[in-house]
Amino acid sequence: MTRYILGALIGSGTYGEVYEAIDTETKEKVALKRIRLNEKEGMPGTALREISILKKLSHRNIISLVSIIHTDALLTMVFPFIDYELKKYIGMNTGKNIMELVNQLICGVHYLHRMNVVHRDLKPQNILVTSDGVLKIADFGLSRSLEIRVPPYSSEVVTLWYRSPELLMGSTSYRFYVDIWSLGCIIYEMITLEPLFPGESKENQLTLIRRKAGTRRSLRGMVEQRLAVPKFVTEIIVRCLDFNYNQRITADEIMEILENEYGAC
């Protein structure tokens, strides 16, 4: 660890902390995700999955894993330092075209699903933006590769406000559509700067969803009233937030709409 000069604590979670640091060899700022290792249990399964998934991903809109440092007591994942969380960047750049960021977010999610990865915790706090406007999906601690068939999965994934109704109702066998629901919530929030379903409990969250998105018609009316956006954006949001996951739009279908209306990634 002598290569890195530790700086400020950026965030913390169940297994460890994330620090700002300086790479003394490159002189660049990096982010260090440090995970404490238990003598009896060893490396947490979430860390193993995160490393395995990140190693196979390579995309402009996905955070890259620079290196791993492993000692008896500590596992450190080294990432590029990304300047802003999504909402802070949008707040600082209100005059800029939000659709450019929406496009990048969709491109990142489409790539993940093409690589058989379900993120399972898409939310604004896990989406970062560089100072020159490049969006990066981050924090793959809850992610799963569907190439490894190990259902049932936990339904206690995805932060409450972005959790799909089937997860709220306890589903343990699910696929990419749980990310698509989160994507719809995030796109809405990127445009309005307000969460669509700010529930206080699982029960309250389901009540909010049923009230606002119980049918496509009611949801479309609400979105059209609140958002001054092109029709295709409304269509993407509404179809992402279909209560019936079997009817929910896929990342491939969203990309088709984008390519026709906005341009490819």
Swiss-Prot record:
Keywords: ATP-binding, Cell cycle, Cell division, Kinase, Mitosis, Nucleotide-binding, Nucleus, Serine/threonine-protein kinase, Transferase. It comes from the Eukaryota. GO terms for molecular function: ATP binding; cyclin-dependent protein serine/threonine kinase activity; protein serine kinase activity. One of its GO terms (cellular component) is nucleus. ATP binds at I10, G11, S12, G13, T14, Y15, G16, E17, V18, K33. It is found in: Nucleus. Its EC number is 2.7.11.22. The active site is at D121 (proton acceptor). It comes from Encephalitozoon cuniculi (strain GB-M1). It catalyses: L-seryl-[protein] + ATP = O-phospho-L-seryl-[protein] + ADP + H(+); L-threonyl-[protein] + ATP = O-phospho-L-threonyl-[protein] + ADP + H(+). Residues 4-263 form the Protein kinase domain. Belongs to the protein kinase superfamily. CMGC Ser/Thr protein kinase family. CDC2/CDKX subfamily. One of its GO terms (biological process) is cell division. This is Probable cell division protein kinase ECU08_0230. Its main location: nucleus. May play a role in the control of the eukaryotic cell cycle.
